[in-house]
Amino acid sequence: AIDIALWDIKGKSIEKPVYKLLGGPVRDKVISYPHVQGMNIPDLLESAKKHIDDGWKFLRWHQLETEPFDKNNNATFDPLKSVEKTIESFEEVRKIFGYDVQICLDVHTRLNPALTIEMCKELEQYKPFFIEDPARSENPNIYRLLRKKISLPLAAGEQWGSKWPFRQVIEEDLIDYARIDLCIVGGLTEALKITHWAETHYIDIVPHNPLGPVSAAACVSLCMASTNIGVQEMPRKPGLIDNKLFPKQIEWDDGYSWCPDVPGLGVDFNIEEAERCAIKPSRSGGNLYRPDGSFTNW
């Protein structure tokens, strides 16, 4: 947060957009993907249609749960049933919307390697853009096995807190897309190092951005100044939330995002509005349990 703020302050102090401080724009706009919602396939298809009608060229959803969350934000996740539903979701989306739209799947590290490999072999025919977090992130060596067994593009990195965990997967070419989280790895400064490092291995970056307007602006600034960009995560159109807190946000149109040609990150923060806002406890993403009662990854 401090690093990103310092880049914004520097840009505003010399009246330059942050993306120009990072090396200058190499593109006018950044292709982006939204979060397609739906706990079941009919709801997912409805959400997918809405996003396609709005102009998005990419869709992203995660490994489908097998039960809705209860009042305590808990749910049962059956890996075998989830794999079946996820494969079916691809089949239905391709049947209805064809292959002009790109699909990204986030496994959320919920499957063991054997199930991941089985699922990916079934998904090959539906040509996903990438499979994200197909294995737990503690042991990058697992990507050696997945690389041998899976032909689909792999994405990983959102859980890594600095450039060092990226070393092995970049140097050994174990992933196709680096999911750098600017708010975890150390801001724009560290993310820029990882981006340039990945470029030497022809690995594109897909910045992780499930957060708010400042994170989105920082990610898009990096993408506008970097050549090796796959796609940018953008959960929803900028400007749909936090409009009073952030009266100026980045731009979006027809599936693309970009930072305006203004000093700093391109966002304005309303301090007076922040002081008036009550702080609400954040809701967790939910707790998942296997059918036998054991805890599993969210």
Predicted features and spans:
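Proline-centered loop/turn at the N-terminus of a beta-strand
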Residues: 17, 31, 102, 153, ...
